[in-house]
């Protein structure tokens, strides 16, 4: 697995709706191009498994940003609370771990046994914000909500 752990995957703009442009700073996009598989199959793993509409918007916007940057996906799946059965990464080339509330995402990652599934994953892992933090072995997340301390 090749992992990119970032604070963000792009520059965010708010017009009528959120728009993301992939960052090119520090050769991020060019490094991705060097390892990108044509016809990649992507999976967006959400931070909040219950926020279906927000998850759909984030998935769609991130995958649009990749397409605009010349990094197209053949398939664009999502993993959130609508997922039925076990997580299956056998036909996935690129995983995007979304950003959001770190403890909520951490619980979801535990529920779907993401760490165990990633041990055999041989593709590209792109993590942003909370997704990057939850990729660490030991993480200190400043409490945001009552009862998190």
Predicted features and spans:
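Short amphipathic alpha-helical segments and helix-helix/interface helices
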Residues: 33, 63, 113-119
């Amino acid at each position: 697995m090749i992992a990119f752990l970032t604070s963000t995957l792009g520059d965010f703009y708010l017009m009528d709706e959120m728009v993301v442009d992939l960052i090119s700073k520090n050769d991020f996009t060019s490094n991705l191009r060097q390892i990108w598989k044509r016809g990649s199959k992507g999976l967006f793993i959400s931070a909040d498994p219950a926020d279906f509409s927000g998850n759909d918007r984030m998935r769609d916007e991130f995958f649009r940003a990749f397409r605009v940057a010349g990094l197209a996906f053949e398939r664009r799946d999502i993993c959130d609370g609508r997922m039925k059965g076990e997580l299956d990464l056998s036909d996935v080339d690129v995983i995007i771990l979304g950003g959001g509330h770190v403890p909520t995402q951490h619980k979801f990652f535990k529920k779907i046994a993401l760490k165990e599934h990633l041990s055999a994953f041989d593709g590209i892992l792109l993590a942003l914000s909370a997704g990057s933090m939850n990729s660490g072995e030991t993480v200190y997340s400043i409490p945001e909500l009552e009862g998190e301390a």
